[in-house]
Amino acid sequence: MVIRINDKNQNYNNVTKLLVKPIKNKSVIGDCPLCKSKNVYLYDTEKFDDLTMMFDDLLSIYTPVSLLPQSYPKADTRLLKSELIYSWNIFNRKSKADVYNIITAICKEKYEYNAELFDQPVGIQELYDSDYLSKHSLLTTNSWEDFVEALKTKNRFHTHYVDLDLLERFCSYIRKPYKTGKIFYRCRISSEVGISATEMGAPPIDKTTDGRANARGIRCLYLGDTAETTIYETRAGAYDYVTVGKFQLKKDIIVVDLKKINQISPFIEGLDCLEYAINKEYLNKINDEMGKIMRRSDSPLDYVPTQYITDFVKSIIHDGKQEYAGIEYKSVMHSGGYNLALFDPDLFECIETEVYAIDTIDYKKHIV
């Protein structure tokens, strides 16, 4: 059976963009038989094997349920087509049947001699292999909760609970460059008069408090992707005045995009798919922790896990220089927005300000 694939059959995201190049390089323009799109790139799996080689490494980490140990939790198994959709974000979620047809066409030889891999629930055997985990797990405790508790109550600065070499490697896969002139925003509650551009930057050391990416006394410039994001993040009340500063980047920088730490493409050259797969739970935890809502009543200790991750990113050196200028993470308060935490506040300059009055706030609630 010939299955033709176009780039609209995939979520064009951080995971799947590496698939698009072979599709476009060895494709024809036509109408897709799956999604019915017109005049798109079509890839013939009968003629080319580029995608076959790309998927082979990923599929090799899975074992059909019939070959897994009896002790392997059945709840941790599911069909391969579901894994590709939900664990790896490779294909869109409209039709599992289409995904099945696509993957069996791409990997037709593997399907011929190992149909169980495609037709039975599958699992990753190493998830419960203590010897493998001891050598490849991001957390030596094998528990995010134990790691957080240790940071808060035992040893904050010289912990051995994290494989820092592995964390650095994961960070290298989510590098994000910004060019000189890039614009971000910062908001502060103010009076009707507003705050001058020269005072819109990071607070001085003696006024620096604990934040998501910095400990008390360590300066850090927090910016948002839009003025709206920064206003939401400020949590201003109804009838407050806020000053929004427009900040311009003064030189090229590279940051770690923690929004993508759990969306690393399995097709990146050099990535160990198995090692990444067994650590996805912890990477999801890092992503969740960066996006965790903090309440006024919460303890500053609740910032410690993200401060630890941020301080490590800040410490990464390459060729005698700091590798990363900051971290990027999703906005807690504004869906779809994101924030940038800069280790050096002087990398950006506030070039103009606007004063806004907050007219109304739309409160939403639920019973707890």
Put a short name on every predicted segment:
Residues 1-181, 186-214, 237-368:
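Active-site and NAD+-binding cores of ADP-ribose-processing enzymes
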Residues 217-223:
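A short, exposed loop/beta-hairpin motif centered on an aromatic-Gly-Thr core
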Residues 227-238:
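Short active-site loop/helix that positions an aromatic residue
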